[in-house]
Amino acid sequence: MKFLKLIPILFIFFGNVPYKNEVHAEIKNPEDFRVLSNEIKKLSISNVEYFIKEGDNYIKNGDFEKAKEFYLDARKLAKQLASFYSDLNSSFKGIDARIPKEMQRKGKETLQILAEVNERLASMYIKTEKPEVAVPLLVETIRIMSPNSPEGKEAYERLIQLGFVETKYKG
């Protein structure tokens, strides 16, 4: 019976003995380990900006379908990022004030770029005579940026031009 009590002690003792074939990970630059902080970021605002830039290039060349694909990719990624930042902001409230501040800053930046993508998509849909598809994008811009922001005011003005709303906003 006493022998059974010694077994955990033996495991602890022999478990801490270094092994001959032990391999240690070596990282010369700690920043290389942070995959999403590198230049080639898939899940980042810079990637959203890349999609927008590519869409703009296709608009200049008159290829609206390709531009739409890039703008929709930018919009999808921006919405994902905004959702992730919002979730992290909520999760850390009351625990560590630094993290919600960072997430709020990044979230605002993401919503700003989402409004930019929505504006470009709405313009493209209006130009290709599909204003019914532009309306939800303009309404979303007003919702995420507020009617008092320059983006919100511009989106509401576009809704007036489309005939979706009639009352002028004096804000």
Could you tell me what each predicted segment is?
Residues 27-28, 92-109, 160-171:
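Alpha-helical linker/edge segments of TPR/alpha-solenoid repeat scaffolds
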Residues 46, 106-113, 151:
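Structural signature of alpha-solenoid helical repeat junctions
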Residues 69-99, 140-157:
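Short, charge-rich amphipathic alpha-helical segments embedded
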